Amino acid sequence: MMVDLRTLADEDFCYLTTTGRVTGAPHEIEIWFSLVPETRALYVLSGGGDRSDWVKNLHRNPEVRIAGERFGGQAREARDTDEDELARRLLVDKYESSPGRLENWRRTALPVVVDLAE
């Protein structure tokens, strides 16, 4: 059965599981996300930039869970400035009603893309 990614895109959080590059142990984080169903691109922003352990571990077969649905994928940095800005805009637009100021996060966080497997 095919999962409707449009429905999952409205969820508040996704869970990103990475494999520790040192320990080999799985690590799961809850994170805000934006999903573009047509391209199967899942966007997240790392407030810690490329220093965050989960970002360092992402390139080793990340798994994404949204509302109980699991996906494998390939992680990468945004392809170009257009995709970089798209990721930032989609995430801030989705969470703009959340408490706190998102403008600094939008400007300084590292956009990360996970291309979800079919």
What residues fall within each predicted segment?
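Extreme N-terminal tail/first-helix region
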Residues: 1-15
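Covalent nucleotidyltransferase core used to form phosphodiester bonds in nucleic acids
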Residues: 4-7, 42-56
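Short beta-strand segments
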Residues: 11-47
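A short, structure-level motif marking secondary-structure boundaries and short turns
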Residues: 6, 39-40, 72-73
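Short, structured beta-strand-loop surface elements
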Residues: 48-117
